[in-house]
Amino acid sequence: MYKIAFDVMGSDLGSLTAIKAASEFIKEHDDLYLVLVGDETEIKQALQQTPIDKTKYEIFPTTQVIDMNGSILDIRRKKDASIIRTLELVRDQKVDGMLTGGNSAAFIGAAHFILGELNNIVRAGFMPTMPNAKNKLTLLLDVGANSENTPEDLVNYAKMANIYYKEVLKNPNASIGLLNIGTEKSKGLELQKQTFKQLEELKNINFIGNVESRDVLTGNVDIIVTDGYSGNICLKACEGAAKVLLTEIKKEITSSFIKKLASLVLKKSFKNVAAKFDYKNHAGAILLGVKGICFKSHGSSDVRSFKATLRMTLDAIKNDIVKKIEKGLIENEY
C-alpha cells in the first residue's frame, strides 16, 4: 500500500476542492492510502459532501495555515502549519510522498530545512511535465524554485531529470537541451555559456545543445534545463499561449451556425487536441533535489489539476525515484 500525505489547506479554491479530488482519485487506486493534513473540522465537513472510504484515509490535524499571502518567515512562526506537518511526515518516513497546492516560497523553504538536499545538490528545482506535439512529455526545470542559479545547478538538473525520464517515463536515452535565446553555442549570458560547456563534457547524457522556448511544445527535445527565473517565464508563457489558442479556436468555430455545423465533423479531433495541451492534465511539479518525493500543484488547482498531481506523485513513489536519483548522483550513473 502506497501512502501519500496531502496538504489540503492553503490553495485558492479551498479544502473542499482538494478533498473532492482525493475522493475521486482514491476510488481509482486500490493500492493507495491518503493522509489528509489540515484543519480537522474543515476536513470532516468537506468529507460529508464528498466522502472517502474510511479504510483508505486518515486525518492528520493541524491548527495553522500558511496562505498565499504568507511570508517565508512563516515556516518558523507557524510550526503547526499544514505544509510543515506534511513535509515532516515525509521526513519521518510516515508516508512515501506528499503534495500541496499551498504557498510556493514556504514549500521550498520548508523542504530545504526539514528534508534537506541530496548529495551535491545546492538548490532544488521545480520540474513539471509538459505535453508536446509528439504525444510525449517534455521535462522543464527549474521553473521557479530559484530566482538565480549556477551552471552547477543546471548540470545537476540535467542529471536528475535524465534519471527521472529513464525511470518514470521509461525513456533510457532522453535528449537534453539548454534553454537559450538561440541555438548557436556562443549564445547567451555567462550562465548559459558555462553550463553549455559543462553539459557538453558529460559523456553519459544525450546533450543536443541549445534550444529555444518554441521547442518546449514541439517534442523535439525531452528535457530542457534552465534557471528558475527564465523557466518560470517560459512555463507560464506556454500555458498562457495554449489556453488562449484553444479559447480562440472554440470561439471561432462557434461564431456562426454554419461554423458550428461544420465543426461537428471535427469535434472529436478538437477535443483530443484540447485535452493534449490542457495544462490541468499535467498540473504538478516535483521539487527535484530534496530528500523526499514532494510535489507542488498550482495554487489555483481545481479537482482535475489535483488529481493530475496525485497521479504524478504516485508514479514517482512507485518508481522509487528519489532513491534512484540519489544513487545515480553518488555513483555518476545518470
From Swiss-Prot:
Enzyme Commission identifier(s): 2.3.1.274
Localization of this protein: Cytoplasm
First-level EC class: transferase
Catalytic activity: a fatty acyl-[ACP] + phosphate = an acyl phosphate + holo-[ACP]
Organism domain of life: Bacteria
Gene3D superfamilies: Isopropylmalate Dehydrogenase (3.40.718.10)
UniProt KW keywords: Cytoplasm, Lipid biosynthesis, Lipid metabolism, Phospholipid biosynthesis, Phospholipid metabolism, Transferase
UniProt GO molecular function: phosphate:acyl-[acyl carrier protein] acyltransferase activity
One CC-aspect GO term: cytoplasm
Disulfide bonds: none
InterPro entries, per the entry: FA_synthesis, Phospholipid_synth_PlsX-like
Subunit structure: Homodimer. Probably interacts with PlsY.
Family designation: Belongs to the PlsX family.
Functional summary from the UniProt entry: Catalyzes the reversible formation of acyl-phosphate (acyl-PO(4)) from acyl-[acyl-carrier-protein] (acyl-ACP). This enzyme utilizes acyl-ACP as fatty acyl donor, but not acyl-CoA.
Name of the protein in question: Phosphate acyltransferase
Organism of provenance: Mycoplasma mycoides subsp. mycoides SC (strain CCUG 32753 / NCTC 10114 / PG1)
Gene it is expressed from: plsX
